[in-house]
């Protein structure tokens, strides 16, 4: 980065530090013992999205960016209504497991006297990231068809409304001294769900606790400052958890003027857009994936079947695969750039759908158990798909073709836009992010077509 660019960044830093919400937040950080390295600063300029953190000076690998005492974290255990939440914990059980935190946010975010008021002051209107759940239905369909995001958003909205009406609203009505249905509305709840989805952290399980993971799942929590760092797959910072505090540490050297990036995990672009409202430009996301819905493979098998009797046989095999929980109506086979993430399920499905009648009878008699000739521990690399048995490849090829038909545009059209800076710049941010999602998915699906062609 040249000196002019660095000077511009430092000027934007000075401008932001004079911004009232940010200056109030930074003052609060000092008050609660949140220690920020003087070599970094918070900004909305020069970042990939909204707030971010940039380096004022060069940083070395392993350098502490900031530390956050656990008392500054906002969770169901630190909110002022923690006793009430604990008292009503049985009635706050939900599939998401987020209700206690969301109720804490409903209370703290709407009270100007809250300990975390300066933190919420960074988002004066509590406006969430520009996630697809807040787009119009027309825009959702236009930009997201075929990506899997559309179905995920519809499921989210249905679950949010159900959770609010069946759990949260009754809680609000039982506690009128602290809550009000006119103030703590479904719309506000939806926005706070987006905040939790985009900004919350979940403490990882200790290794010796893995066996009890279903029993002792730790609830999400809001971590000031840490949630301001943006994400890229090739990140340069990492959040560490200690008994006393949380610490953000650099994982590589960072030059002055560069942005600090945390990681949200190994996330494909469709997941990033769905949960965080952005996507990484191709080819920067090394975690990109494409899904083929399991029911699409079933549809391909039906199309391959020559007679009605063959189709009935395929249905029997599909039903059996569902019975032994290899496939499901809402499941998907996931293909990455380097490997197949659902190798075991994919191989079992293709094998059963393509085996002879006698082989299936024996397989069914053994309830799906058989002596594996393959090494179960060996990962199926994407490039190795070309070595699968011919009938398997034909079925997978047709499944990829059917998946591609669900999109509104062809890969060539997406490629032309991505490679034309002028045309790409004219797109809205929503259009750009959606394009990156579709382009990455279609590239992988076309790779599958190439690897499975006869």
Swiss-Prot record:
First-level EC class: transferase
InterPro entries listed in its UniProt record: N-lys_methylase_SETD6, Rubisco_LSMT_subst-bd, Rubisco_LSMT_subst-bd_sf, SET_dom, SET_dom_sf, SETD3_SETD6_MTase, SETD6_SET
CDD domains associated with the record: SET_SETD6
Pfam families to which the protein is assigned, alphabetical: Rubis-subs-bind, SET
Enzyme Commission identifier(s): 2.1.1.-
Protein location: Nucleus
Protein name: N-lysine methyltransferase setd6
């Amino acid at each position: 980065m040249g000196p002019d660019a660095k000077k511009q960044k430092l000027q934007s830093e000075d401008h932001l530090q004079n911004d009232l919400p940010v200056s109030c937040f930074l003052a609060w950080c000092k008050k609660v013992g949140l220690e920020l390295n003087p070599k970094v600063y918070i900004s909305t300029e020069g970042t990939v999205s909204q707030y971010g953190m940039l380096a004022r000076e060069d940083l070395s690998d392993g350098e502490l960016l900031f530390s956050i005492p656990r008392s500054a974290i906002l969770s169901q255990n630190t909110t002022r209504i923690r006793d009430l939440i604990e008292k009503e914990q049985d009635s706050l059980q939900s599939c998401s497991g987020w209700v206690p935190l969301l109720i804490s946010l409903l209370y703290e975010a709407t009270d100007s006297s809250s300990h975390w008021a300066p933190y919420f002051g960074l988002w004066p209107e509590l406006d969430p990231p520009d996630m697809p759940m807040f787009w119009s239905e027309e825009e959702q369909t236009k930009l997201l068809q075929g990506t899997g995001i559309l179905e995920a958003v519809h499921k989210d909205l249905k679950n949010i409304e159900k959770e609010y009406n069946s759990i949260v609203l009754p809680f609000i009505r039982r506690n009128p001294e602290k809550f009000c249905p006119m103030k703590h509305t479904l719309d506000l709840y939806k926005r706070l769900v987006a905040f939790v989805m985009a900004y919350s952290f979940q403490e990882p399980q200790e290794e010796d606790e893995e066996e009890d993971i279903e029993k002792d799942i730790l609830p999400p929590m809001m971590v000031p400052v840490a949630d301001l760092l943006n994400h890229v797959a090739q990140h340069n910072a990492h959040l560490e958890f200690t008994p006393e505090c949380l610490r953000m540490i650099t994982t590589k050297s960072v030059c002055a003027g560069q942005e600090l990036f945390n990681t949200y995990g190994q996330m494909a672009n469709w997941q990033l857009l769905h949960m965080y409202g952005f996507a990484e430009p191709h080819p920067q996301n090394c975690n990109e994936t494409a899904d083929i819905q399991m029911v699409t493979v079933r549809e391909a098998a039906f199309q391959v079947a020559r007679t009605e009797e063959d189709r009935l046989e395929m249905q029997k095999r599909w039903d059996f695969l569902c019975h032994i929980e290899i496939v499901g109506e809402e499941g998907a086979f996931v293909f990455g750039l380097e490997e197949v993430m659902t190798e075991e399920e994919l191989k079992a499905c293709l094998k059963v759908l393509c085996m002879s009648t006698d082989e299936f009878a024996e397989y069914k008699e053994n309830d799906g158990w058989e002596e594996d000739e393959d090494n179960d521990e060996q990962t199926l690399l994407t490039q190795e798909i070309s070595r699968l048995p011919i009938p398997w490849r034909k079925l997978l090829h047709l499944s990829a073709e059917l998946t591609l038909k669900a999109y509104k545009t062809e890969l060539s059209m997406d490629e032309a836009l991505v490679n034309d800076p002028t045309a790409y710049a004219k797109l809205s941010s929503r259009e750009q992010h959606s394009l990156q999602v579709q382009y990455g998915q279609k590239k992988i699906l076309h790779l599958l077509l190439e690897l499975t062609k006869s």
